[in-house]
Structures are given as structure tokens and as C-alpha cells.
């Protein structure tokens, strides 16, 4: 496919027979290689697992410290901030039913260079996240088995995740559904324990988790926003299934909005209830910042509830997230390798199971290394992961505004202009609030990506290679 001078959005329904999603994929210059077997419910479950219904557990202590106790307010503001990103993802998912998600969306919406940079940026998130999740799981397991060192759990969780993903996407979807049910069941048990505590007078309802113990402070809420936003980062994982979802982009767009609404309600509920048990002026320090929610579970329902919540968080919630995270990362690596943006070696697909085996194994090895090296640096890795995601989301908003710039459909005016502009402004502010060291690491990573893109472009200019399908224009420098 050659670059064109027009940038018209794709039609809602391509002409002719056949699967509309496959026709759109072929119109973009790709062929269907992955197995399109996932229903809307499967995609929603996949998104819920990736975003983890119990996600606030692992970072509750950090969020509470930074927000001065206004944890519910932080997650509410984070939900509003990520709504604009969800709208942009939904719009681009309908236009480009391709597995690369933000990489593909920005590439086709704003050109080769920004597309590569968005993929490179989100790759920072994806390459670190599986290892980070193994660190969180190892910390939770160490609470239950202190005789075993934390690091020994890292390869265990990586191996389990890899074995499940190598079974294929259908098997992974089944495991995800079982894990989701278990997480929701544990959350119900925690809510019931809090209700019992309220009835017994051991704790009282309060506005403090929303408004603070003293005067409401927007500065404190925004200070904790980067950590809370990490819990909502899952839209890209959903859209990596564009070539495996029945209904393609339409199913992905619907799933994105459903998942955001569901997790926003779950996140706000659990952090609000947990914060009721924390006395005013409390500051979690050392290991207590990591185990804060687990310790609160013991106050609410005794040591049995603490053990249930801890084991569920480690063995079910975080493990399930690690499985999905590994699957998502491998799909992004596959997509970029297929486009020859990274070595094509990783674009190989197993003919029988229709999964990117080499990409999965590469992610597994990298996750093990990161988990072992950064076992005591989870707060920094968390901030770096957030930086990578938010930087990619910023480029997504730019792509939406640029791609739809010539469209005059007033019905989509909010989605194509106002929403991406607001989303971009909020994300830029949130990026500025991340840790200074995380910003430095992120900027260095992006600079390295720009150099790699420039170098590969120069090499490709002197050689004949298989080119990826071209976007509407190419704004690459030089």
C-alpha cells in the first residue's frame, strides 16, 4: 500500500461480503494471522484482568501517603482523566482493527515516526510491567512464607505465566475468567467484613477518603495521580486483541468503555472502605507501605481474611495480570516485528496455536531478569511504567486530532477534538508529576528510540526490505 495524500477515515462498513474486521485489516495491507475467536465477553474479561479488579491493594499505602488519605478522590480523578484516553482508543479501534494498538493507531493516524515513538514508549511499560507484577506477587508470598526469599518467587510466576500463554489465547481466556470470578468473590468477602465492622461500631463512615481529614487539597490528589493512573492502564491491552476479537474494532471499542466503568467503581469502593480503618495522620513507612491493605484486612476481618486477601492478590490477581501482561507485550512485539520496526525474528507465529511464540519467550526471559534485578525498586519501576504508558497515550491523542482534522461530522466533534485535547492536557500534567528519576529514565528511553528509528531508516534507505503497509502520510524526520 502506497502513501496517499488523503486522510479520510475508513467507512463504517466496507463494501462486499466477508468479515468486516478482516476486510478492514486487508484494506490496511495485512493478512489475518492470529486466531479470531474471542467474544466481547472474553475481551471484557481480558481487560478486567489486565487492569486487575484488586489493583489498588498493592499500591494502597503509597497512594494513601501521597494523597494525605484522600485515596477515593484520587481514583475518581484518575477515572475522569483516563476516560478521555478511553474515548480516543475507542475511536481509533474502529478505524484500525490492527493488533499493534497505540503503535498502529498513531502510525496510521499521525505518521511513521510518531507511530514508532508511541510503540517504543508503550514498550517501556510492557517490558517492565510483567517483571513488576512478579515483584508484587513475590512480596505478597513472602508475607505468608517469610522463610523463603522474595526473589525465588519471581521465576516461578514467570514460568506459570509463560506455560499458560503458550497454550493459546482461548486457554488463556478461560484461565482469565476463573481468576476474575475469584477476585470478585474475595472483594465481596472484604466488603461484607467491613459492613460487619460498621454494624459492630468498630469503624464509622466518613468523607475523609474523598475530602481529606482537614481541608481538601487538590495538590495532594494530583501528587498521587500517577500511581492511581497505573491501575487504569489497560486500554492498550484490550486493543492488542483487535485481530483476535470477533467484531474487531467495534468489539474492542465497546469493551474499552465497559471495562473503564467497571474498574472505576470497584477501585473507588475498595480504597474508600480500606481508608476508613486508617487513623488520621497515619504515614505508612518501609514494608508497611507495601502491606498496608493486607494489614487493614486483618483489622477488618482478622488473620483469616488477611491470608485470603494476600494469597488472592499474589496467586490470583497479580498472577492473572502477569499472564495477560505477558500476552499483551508479546502481541505488541509481534506487531512491531511484523512491520520490521524491530527484528523480524519475533514476528513468527506458531501455525497450530496461532500465537507469537518467540515474542512470548523473549518477554518471559526479560521479565525474569527485571524481576530479579529490581526486586527492591518497585516504586521506581512503577513510576517508569506509568511514564511509558502516559507518553504513548499523549501521542494517541495527537493522532486522533490529526487524523480526524479534516472531518466535519458534528456528531463526533467531542470525541475528535475536545476529548483528545483535554486528555492530552491532563496526561502532560500527570507526566510532570511522576518521579524525577522516572522522568529521566523515560526521556532517555525515548531519545534512544529516536536514534534507533533514525539509524534503521538510514540503513533501510540503502537496502531492499519488505516494507510495512504505509500510513496516510509519513512525517518522519530526515
Role assignments for model-derived ranges:
Residues 54-150, 157, 259-262, 268-269, ...:
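Extracellular loop-to-transmembrane helix junctions
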Residues 71-72, 149, 178-311:
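Helix-loop-helix junctions that connect adjacent transmembrane segments
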Residues 104-105, 111, 142-144, 255-325, ...:
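TM-loop-TM module centered on a large, flexible mid-protein loop between adjacent transmembrane helices
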Residues 385, 389, 414-478:
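A generic transmembrane alpha-helix motif of multi-pass inner-membrane proteins
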Residues 1-70, 82-87, 99, 208-209, ...:
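Membrane-interface "cap" regions at the ends of multi-pass membrane proteins
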Residues 175, 346-353, 393-439:
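C-terminal membrane-solvent junction of multi-pass transporters and transport-like membrane proteins
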